[in-house]
């Protein structure tokens, strides 16, 4: 497992070196990858697996095609650049409220989860988001209009504060 993290960090370092950028602080990490700020006020996310990179990049490309930088009052980072060999995407840095992290999203096809799984997921998300759950559902519905189906919905990815 540490090998994958080391590889993601090495990919991030190669990405910035290839573009004459510098890494600043780490902004976060999760199952999908690791995110750093750069010296040009952008964020780069080095993904741990190629399918995650492809999903993240392709969702950002769809957002770009439709000129989406805001959904229901939440900022959406714009795609700046990417590297398909290093599995890195570069986006604008946005402040809350925001919607971000699309590595687990589905494009043009709704994920096929069993009803029992979806019922449990709905309960968990309602509890996590509390009074904002209706707003989260509206954000998800708006993205579905563009063929984007969010799967990794959590307060770190959809933030109102």
Indicate residue ranges for each PLM-predicted region.
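Catalytic-loop of the protein kinase fold
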Residues: 143-155, 160
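Conserved structural core of kinase catalytic domains
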Residues: 71-133
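Conserved hydrophobic core/spine positions of the Hanks-type protein kinase catalytic domain
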Residues: 138-139
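Juxta-kinase regulatory segment immediately upstream of eukaryotic protein kinase catalytic domains
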Residues: 1-25, 58
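Conserved hydrophobic "DFG−1" position in protein kinase catalytic cores
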Residues: 37-38, 46, 81, 90-93, ...
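Short, solvent-exposed loop/turn segments at secondary-structure junctions
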Residues: 42-43, 49-51, 84-85, 94-98, ...
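ATP-binding glycine-rich loop module of kinase domains
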Residues: 24-69
